[in-house]
């Protein structure tokens, strides 16, 4: 079985990576280094002590030890992987040991099949802290939409889709988008993929199911010729994979065939029939011209917003 987006892998050196793209064949997996063994680390699991590494530190760490892993993201040779952690496989075990995880798991299970639910992030590898957020994975767009609707409508004492203002402010600072706070919140609130469980934040993350994996278009991952930055206005024609990575928006535009977002900030930003305004890098490939948002980690000067909200 191939790795999927949001799986984790552990290498022979006990380095823990998050998988950031679907396995499209080849000898390596596109990942990002998250945790490394450290005798003085503040994260502890059955594997020992670890510390979490930030974006820049992850590149420095690999540059010094495995420079061959470095590309646009971190490419881990499949032969160096000793363990693959799958969100759906690990969730029942994690839920049995954690009350908050179990509560959200049981809540979601009342609306979608249990085998379509997983957990990723620090909980997946057992390195969560007491204040860690919960990152749940939902497989398949139909199930993802059902889970979002359930969370958005939840108003009980434990699980709720209503976030306090302080949490919205924290999310805005974390994302640091090229949008005003008011515009950011207007887009985020209707996505319905965020909630809290007894005061702890959780979110729902989409991953393709088996049938949707058959529709994976490798051309969306091709590196095209960069033409320059541009701002466009266009109607969204298709958005089935708007919550995927990359988020895909087919648009009605005389030159641009689709808008791709490689930053999660602009996933699920618009629906079919809406008019969007987007700024990013125009890329030309052998089969299309597209606008790419998220060409850098910070995505400065790049954004997507719906003009229909």
Language-model features and meaning:
Residues 1-131, 139-309:
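Catalytic core of pol beta-like nucleotidyltransferases
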């Amino acid at each position: 079985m191939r790795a999927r987006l949001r799986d984790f892998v552990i290498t022979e050196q006990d380095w823990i990576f998050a998988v950031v793209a679907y396995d499209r064949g080849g000898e390596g997996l596109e990942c990002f280094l998250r945790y490394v063994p450290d005798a003085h680390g503040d994260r502890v699991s059955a594997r020992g002590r670890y510390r979490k590494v930030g974006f820049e530190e992850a590149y420095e760490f690999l540059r010094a030890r495995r420079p061959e892993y470095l590309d646009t993201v971190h490419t881990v040779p499949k032969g160096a992987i000793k363990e693959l952690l799958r969100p759906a496989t690990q969730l029942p075990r994690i839920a049995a040991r954690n009350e908050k995880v179990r509560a959200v798991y049981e809540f979601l299970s009342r609306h979608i099949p249990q085998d379509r639910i997983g957990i990723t992030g620090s909980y997946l590898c057992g390195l969560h802290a007491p204040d860690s957020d919960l990152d749940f994975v939902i497989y398949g767009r139909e199930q993802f939409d059902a889970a979002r609707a359930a969370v958005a409508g939840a108003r009980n004492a434990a699980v709720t889709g209503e976030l306090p203002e302080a949490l919205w402010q924290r999310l805005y600072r974390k994302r640091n988008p090229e949008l005003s706070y008011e515009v950011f919140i207007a887009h985020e609130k209707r996505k319905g993929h965020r909630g809290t469980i007894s005061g702890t934040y959780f979110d729902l993350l989409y991953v393709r199911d088996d049938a949707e994996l058959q529709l994976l278009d490798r051309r969306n991952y091709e590196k095209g010729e960069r033409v320059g930055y541009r701002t466009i206005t266009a109607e969204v024609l298709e958005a089935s994979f708007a919550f995927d990575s990359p988020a895909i928006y087919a648009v009605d535009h005389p030159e641009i065939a689709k808008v791709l977002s490689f930053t999660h900030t602009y996933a699920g930003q618009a629906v079919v029939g809406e008019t969007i305004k987007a700024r990013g890098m125009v890329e030309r490939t052998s089969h299309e011209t597209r606008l790419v948002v998220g060409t850098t980690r910070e995505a400065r000067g790049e954004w997507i917003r719906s003009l229909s909200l």
